[in-house]
Amino acid sequence: MANIRKKHPVLKIINHSFIDLPAPSNISSWWNFGSLLGMCLILQIITGLFLAMHYTADTTTAFSSVTHICRDVNYGWMIRYLHANGASMFFMCQFLHVGRGLYYGSYTYLETWNICVILLFATMATAFMGYVLPWGQMSFWGATVITNLLSAIPYIGTDLVEWIWGGFSVDKATLTRFSAFHFIHSFIITALVNVHLLFLHETGSNNPLGINSDADKIPFHPYYTIKDILGVVGLLAVLSSLVLFAPDLLGDPDNYTPANPLNTPPHIKPEWYFLFANAILRSIPNKLAGVLALVMSILILTLVPFLHTSKQRSMTCRPISQCLFWILVADLLTLTWIGGQPVEHPFIIIGRVASVLYFTIIIIFMPLAGWLENYLMNW
């Protein structure tokens, strides 16, 4: 059996990636989120496939088809809520995965890190299109508001928006193409994940100390497969509890009202995992500047490797950088809270301060902290 997995053309790839892969002996539970993301992706593809069998991408029947799935299809309600809450788990794991990369300096693997940022954009686009499909009030108005942001692009903005809509407003053509793109995007994400793993296995995993671990490596199986299985069981327990006891906890009540272009909801807001970006967008009065800030809130991650000034890779032994990192986490939580609040005083000013702080910490304070820590080490 050992010879087959080491010599068979297909099994050999699996063996080198998940069985005999040399891994640092000291990686902690923060390294579990990669496998959890893989499990979430598989779950999303399977549940999405079953939902696609019953869903109809038509403005007159989309809302009814989702109701039909929940009421008439065997375990349709569970499939629907596994898919919806699975997306929340996906983003939770993704944010923690990126946060771990920032804390332990994994961004120094440039190709792996840049693919990670592209994956973040791809999953956000996929989730946005998926949010439109139930064709509730928040689906319709969310699609209208977010796609309309592209009109801020000079010269081609208006034409681009109408091209995406397939008409002069969000309608049947928009829903049909969003449904098609949402379905195909999951496979694009799968391809990007494979590229991400390819680059990761070229360099090997980072570790909490941020040092070269070639002298002390262990095989991935059985040590880390068992560790990952524990993480998967934990995540499934949380997801199951959410689906079975509070399936609508992370959703919006407005989405249980069919889309009505003549009735605007008092407060249009996206899903919780977009709220931080929504807060940054709203904090800037100018439309084009707001859109640029929205894009830069994610794209700024590509600059992090070039802003690294410390002689140490990881923040494990860098107390000043640790403080800044946790201030950044608190700032992102504040932005998430602000993104879900109405646009009024004092939320406007809090959002602006938090948005400025977000960019300032990453662009100015983090590099300065690195230089200061280098100086203190030589002092």
Swiss-Prot record:
Binding site for heme b b562: 83, 182
Any one of the GO BP annotations: mitochondrial electron transport, ubiquinol to cytochrome c
PROSITE patterns given in the database record: CYTB_CTER (PS51003), CYTB_NTER (PS51002)
Parts of the chain that traverse the membrane: 33-53, 77-98, 113-133, 178-198, 226-246, 288-308, 320-340, 347-367
Keyword hit for Magnesium: no
Required co-factors: heme b
Residues at which a ubiquinone binds: 201
Binding residues annotated for heme b b566, in chain numbering: 97, 196
Any one GO cellular component localisation term in the record: respiratory chain complex III
Membrane topology, as annotated: Multi-pass membrane protein
Additional record remark: Heme 1 (or BL or b562) is low-potential and absorbs at about 562 nm, and heme 2 (or BH or b566) is high-potential and absorbs at about 566 nm.
Protein name: Cytochrome b
Native source organism of the sequence: Dendrogale melanura
